[in-house]
């Protein structure tokens, strides 16, 4: 999908870019695959703020996505490529031969009319989903399961991809976008190809209001707050942090501090860590 550049007719339009939506073939979603998406504004069930900088934005409906791809052996035809406001990637509507309809994440190169299949016997073709043990070494994949049958959890955002590096016993070595090489059970499933809409990271939002449309509220620096609001706050004019390292609003070390648990059970499955 190409990037569209706007003319600088206003200060907000200057340097603003957006998607041209050339791949989108339908603007009306499948009603049977929609679910309500109540506004949370970053609050939990007690009404307490748990995620900052959330609130407002355009009303949305959730598109029910098939991350499990467990309908084996029944061919499906791509009916439409659609925009999804809840994720960076586009989605594709599949019409199965038995009449069922499902949404999937649209990989790069998937077009309307293409036939896709799930299952161990599926061909190595963009959009097909099969167990990792049936995928050749060197294949580019996305939507990877971590537990068999749970559904894809890794490599789902726009332009993301991973690669099968090798096979060792009941595990398959997969190199992720971060450079991390990880062992994943060979019975876990993955989809062939790279996630589409790879130009998404090049979009320049251009103005603050466009973030508000997405439900993102302003981020205020801690150094301009009062001492009771943030560890960096207070002082006369611009002052240093006054602590050994930068702190989060709750007094925890941040900006470089490792947060992964040292006794994480999945540590033994990581062959090589991510790039620094």
From Swiss-Prot:
rRNA-binding keyword on record: yes
GO-annotated cellular components: large ribosomal subunit
Q: Which GO terms describe its molecular function?
A: rRNA binding; structural constituent of ribosome; transferase activity
Give the keywords, sorted: Ribonucleoprotein, Ribosomal protein, RNA-binding, rRNA-binding
Comp. bias intervals (Basic residues): 255-276
Chain spans, region Disordered: 36-55, 219-276
Cited Pfam families: Ribosomal_L2, Ribosomal_L2_C
Q: InterPro entries from the entry? A: NA-bd_OB-fold, Rib_uL2_dom2, Ribosomal_uL2, Ribosomal_uL2_bac/org-type, Ribosomal_uL2_C, Ribosomal_uL2_CS, Ribosomal_uL2_dom3, Ribosomal_uL2_RNA-bd_dom
Protein name, entry field? Large ribosomal subunit protein uL2
- Give the similarity note: Belongs to the universal ribosomal protein uL2 family.
**GO annotation, biological process:** cytoplasmic translation
Q: What does this protein do?
A: One of the primary rRNA binding proteins. Required for association of the 30S and 50S subunits to form the 70S ribosome, for tRNA binding and peptide bond formation. It has been suggested to have peptidyltransferase activity; this is somewhat controversial. Makes several contacts with the 16S rRNA in the 70S ribosome.
What is its quaternary makeup? Part of the 50S ribosomal subunit. Forms a bridge to the 30S subunit in the 70S ribosome.
